[in-house]
Amino acid sequence: MSSSSQASSRRQWCYLCDLPKMPWAMIWDFSEAVCRGCVNYEGADRIELLIDTARQLKRTHVMQDGRSPGPQPGGKHGPAGKEGPMEAGRPPSERYERGRGEYVSARLPNGLPRLEDGGPPEVSRQSPTARRTLVGAVPPNLMAQGLVGAPHGLLTAMPLNPRAGSAALTIPAPMLNEISKRQALSMGLSVGVPSFMAPEFEKEFKEKQRNAEALAELSESVRNRADDWAGRPKPMRDALHTLSGCTPFNVRFKKDHGLVGRVFAFDAKLMVEFELKIFIEYPCGSGNVFPSILALVKHMFHDSQKDTGKVINSGYKYVEYEKRHGTGDWRLLSELLSDAVRAFKEMPAPDALPQPYLDASCSMLPTALCHIGRPTQPRVRRRKASPDPDGAERMSSEELRQHWPLSAYPGIPGHMPATSLASAGQAPEGHGSDPSPITALMSVADNVGTASSKDGPGSSGHSANAGRQNSTSPSPGGGQRRLASRNGEPSAGSSTGGPATVTDQSAVMGGEGSAGGGGAPLCCTICQERLEDTHFVQCPSVAGHKFCFPCTRDFIRRQGPGSEVYCPSGEKCPLVGSNVPWAFMQGEISTILAGDVKVKKERDP
C-alpha cells in the first residue's frame, strides 16, 4: 500500500463539513466526530444542535433516486471499451465522461450517494492534479446567495482543456437539496422548512430555528450590554440594573400553573421609543429562549391547549411571577412590569421586586450558550512591563464591580448552593457570575484602563491573554479553554476540574501585568517581594491584589483539603457585577501546588 493510500485511510470524515480530516484534527467529545474547524467556527455550544439537525435531515431525506449501486467486484476499470457497458447501465443522471487525468472522489461521506470512478482512490484524494479545476454543479442562484459553496465531497471534475467536450457530473435534485440545507444550516443561515420534510419533524425544525434566532439575539444583547447600557439615560440604566438584580425568577402561565419558566435577562430595545426587552427560558432548564412575553404566551397557550385560536395583544396579563420562592406568593407580571416601567418612565415598585431563585436541578442559564468570546473587532495590544499607579487607582474596586451589569458574564453557577441565592438581599449570580476568575479578569483588562498585561511577540505562553489570536505562543490546550468557556464549564470553586481548568490556571499564572509606562514595581500583596511582570496570581476582583506563587501555595495549604479557597488576601472578593465571592477551581489549586514555578525576576535598576 502506498504512503498516499495509507494517509487517506487514516483520514476520517467530519460529520458537519464532510471533509476528510486527520485524526489529530478531529474532536470526539460530541455525539458525532467533528473537526476542530467546525467547532471553532460554530462554537462548541451549537455543535450538538447542528449535529442533531443534520441527523434529522439525513433521516428524512431518503434520496432514493439519488443513490447509486456500490462498487462492483473488481474495482479497477479496464480500457474504455470495457467500461462502456458499465456506463450504459447507469441512470442518465449518473453518467459522466472523464477528461484525461481528471478524477472524481469515489468516496462520499455520511450516507450520501456514492458515485463510481474509474481512477485509483488514492490518486483521486491525494494527487494535486485531481484538484485542478473543480466546479460544483449547483444552481447559480444558490451560489450567488452564498447558500451553497462548493459541495464538500461532491465537486464536479472539469477537464483542463475546455475543448475536450467532457460533460460535468450532474448532481440529482434530492442530493442537491440535502447539500443546500446542510451547508446553510452549518453556516448558521436561516433556511425555510423543506417541503419534503416529514410532518413530525417540521414542528421541531421550526422550533429549533426559532430558538437559534432567539439565542443569537440574546448573544448580541449580552455581548454589547456593557457599552450599550453605559450610554443610556440614568433612569433607564437604573431600571435595567434593578431588574437584572432580581434575575433569575420563576414565571408561570395563569391558566395552567404547571407551565413554568424563568426570566433570566433584561435589556432595552429601540422601537419608536426605548422599550423593555425581556428574555425568558421555558420550560426551566430546557434552553429554549423566548425574547418577548408575547412569544412565550403564544407557546404556553399551545402547550395548554386552551384557547389556541385566541388573539393575544399583550401577554403580561396571562403570566404570573413568583415574588419569593416557596412562599406561594404569585403575582401578575403586569404589576411588576407596568406600561410605565416597560417604557422606562417609572422605576419598578420596590415592594413588587422578586427575589432571585436558581433551581439547583437546572442551574445552567441560557446565557451560557451565548458567543461572548467573539469580539467584533480585534484589538491590537502592546505589552508594557511597568504598572501605572494612577491608572490602578482610577476606579475603586467597588466601582469596578458595579461598572458591568449583572448579566455581563454568562456561566454555570452550579457550584454555588441554592440557599445563597434564595436569601434576601443576595444578588443573583446566575448570569452575573463568570465561568472562571480569569475570564472576569480578562474582561476587566479589555474594558477598563486598569492594570493589564499587554501581549507581544515575546509574551509567555502563560500570559493572561493566552489563547487569543494575537498571541504568538499560546498555552497548551488554549483552544480547549476557549471551548470550555463557551460551553459553560463550572466556574471557580467547582469541584470538577479538567484540562480547561488547568489551562485557566495557566492564564491566572499569567496575571495582569500593567498598563502604565513607569512607576512602582509589581510587588506581592503579602510578602512585598518584587514580582515578575507576567508570572503571578491576580485577583479578578481587586486590581491591587497580586500574589507570588510561594505565598499563594502557603495560603492554600493553610485552608486545609476540601475547603473553598478564596482570595489569598484573606478577603472574600466578589466577582464584578455580583456579590458572590470568587474561589479557586480544584484544577487551579492542583496546578499551583504541583511544584515551584521558578521564574527569573527582573533585576532592580
UniProtKB/Swiss-Prot annotation:
The keyword Coiled coil applies. Residues 92-101, 385-402 have a biased composition (Basic and acidic residues). One of its GO terms (cellular component) is nucleus. Pfam families: IRF-2BP1_2, IRF-2BP1_2_M, zf-C3HC4_IRF-2BP1_2. Its main location: nucleus. Residues 200-229 form a coiled coil. It is found in: Nucleus. Residues 460-475, 492-506 have a biased composition (Polar residues). It comes from the Eukaryota. GO terms for biological process: regulation of transcription by RNA polymerase II. GO terms for molecular function: transcription corepressor activity. Keywords: Coiled coil, Nucleus, Repressor, Transcription, Transcription regulation. The keyword Nucleus applies. Residues 524-571 are annotated as: Cys-rich. SUPFAM superfamilies: RING/U-box. Residues 61-130, 373-517 are annotated as: Disordered. PANTHER family: INTERFERON REGULATORY FACTOR 2-BINDING PROTEIN 1, MYELIN TRANSCRIPTION FACTOR 1-RELATED. Belongs to the IRF2BP family. Acts as a transcriptional repressor. This is Interferon regulatory factor 2-binding protein 1. It comes from Danio rerio.
